[in-house]
Amino acid sequence: MRAKGTRKNYQHLWRWGTMLLGMLMICSAAEQLWVTVYYGVPVWKEATTTLFCASDAKAYDTEVHNVWATHACVPTDPNPQEVVLQNVTENFNMWKNNTVEQMHEDIISLWDQSLKPCVKSTPLCVTLNCTDLTNATYANGSSEERGEIRNCSFNVTTIIRNKIQKEYALFYRLDIVPIDKDNTSYTLINCNTSVITQACPKVSFEPIPIHYCAPAGFAILKCNDKKFNGTGPCTNVSTVQCTHGIKPVVSTQLLLNGSLAEGEVVIRSENFTNNAKTIIVQLNKSVEINCTRPNNNTKKGIAIGPGRTLYAREKIIGDIRQAHCNISKAKWNDTLKQIVTKLKEQFRNKTIVFNQSSGGDPEIVMHSFNCGGEFFYCKTTQLFNSTWLFNSTWNDTERSDNNETIIIPCRIKQIINSGRK
């Protein structure tokens, strides 16, 4: 979507302008179409303007998206208007779009505000003496589960600043990094690079649709071509005052709760021949993924300074079971088949290989997302582990009955990098 504005014309055209304005008013009355006119000369041009947001946020709801939208957005238009532009062709570029950039800025603002009630854990950047959690029963005894949660002791400054007190708490393995070779001394991750914040599991976190609207004198151009690839000319164009509702879901690898394509699966990239560019796949059918963290934790408050309390895990009740996500193998394989069909239209006579990430930050290597205020990091090796030959046959490295469910192991991250002071 792009914003278009009307441009002022200061030339002395008032005589012809008055006549033209009268003609436009007659046409408008006949067809119920309106256009902003300055001195009788309607001129459209591409414009960069500040959009504003609209939402149906509930002021009484303490969920962080509702709290942010209540203060930052206006109520939605109960009767939105869309005008189809006949015989109009416009060029669009989804990869260089001012609307998207403003959305990103708003998401950053939303997350900053959402993390403000959370405790800054930077004062906890001390040496942690950690051991594997003992006296715990593991559900299946896998090595992935063992060592996932560690029991750590550390010294913290109490409310009285010159007093030191020894405390202990349970930390996820993703939240700590070793500082010696014997794997007993640790520190919180990202302590030496930026401000870190404790995630807030108690905070309600459920994205709501956000609409972006153009101010008076501007309109948003919308491309309605169902197979539009993201760049180039679009022949089915309309104008709207606001976009559709967009849920600001933040995730990596898999896009959650996105919009579905009407018709076939659509793949988009800024440049398919450049392997450094991202390829976005828009599915035509949703694939359900159910995620859970089955552990039952008890928490305790640890004073880490005046007015600051860190809520840490004290113990785990019952079995230690790994967080995981479930997805239907049949639906996933059918989705991959449709994606491969579209990829082969771009890469002819090529073998398509779905493989896991070769390395990098946890957010890149794993499927990361926020669920109920907790940050999940899930291994997608089982999802991206197949080879599709150029003659339309495929070879799954782990063939099995398609009626089964793929169980994706996940890890929880409690300490997050807030990135700014």
From Swiss-Prot:
The keyword Signal applies. It is found in: Virion membrane. Residues 378-410 are annotated as: V4. One of its GO terms (biological process) is clathrin-dependent endocytosis of virus by host cell. It comes from the Viruses. Keywords: AIDS, Clathrin-mediated endocytosis of virus by host, Disulfide bond, Fusion of virus membrane with host endosomal membrane, Fusion of virus membrane with host membrane, Glycoprotein, Host-virus interaction, Membrane, Signal, Viral attachment to host cell, Viral penetration into host cytoplasm, Virion, Virus endocytosis by host, Virus entry into host cell. Residues 1-31 form the signal peptide. Residues 152-191 are annotated as: V2. Disulfide bonds join 53-73, 118-200, 125-191, 130-152, 213-242, 223-234, 291-325, 378-410. One of its GO terms (cellular component) is membrane. Gene3D superfamilies: Human immunodeficiency virus 1, Gp160, envelope glycoprotein. Residues 357-367 are annotated as: CD4-binding loop. Glycans are attached at residues 87, 97, 129, 135, 140, 151, 155, 183, 192, 229, 236, 257, 271, 284, 290, 296, 326, 333, 349, 355, 385, 391, 395, 403. Residues 130-151 are annotated as: V1. Residues 291-324 are annotated as: V3. HIV-1 lineages are divided in three main groups, M (for Major), O (for Outlier), and N (for New, or Non-M, Non-O). The vast majority of strains found worldwide belong to the group M. Group O seems to be endemic to and largely confined to Cameroon and neighboring countries in West Central Africa, where these viruses represent a small minority of HIV-1 strains. The group N is represented by a limited number of isolates from Cameroonian persons. The group M is further subdivided in 9 clades or subtypes (A to D, F to H, J and K). This is Truncated surface protein. It comes from Human immunodeficiency virus type 1 group M subtype B (isolate NY5) (HIV-1). The gene is env.
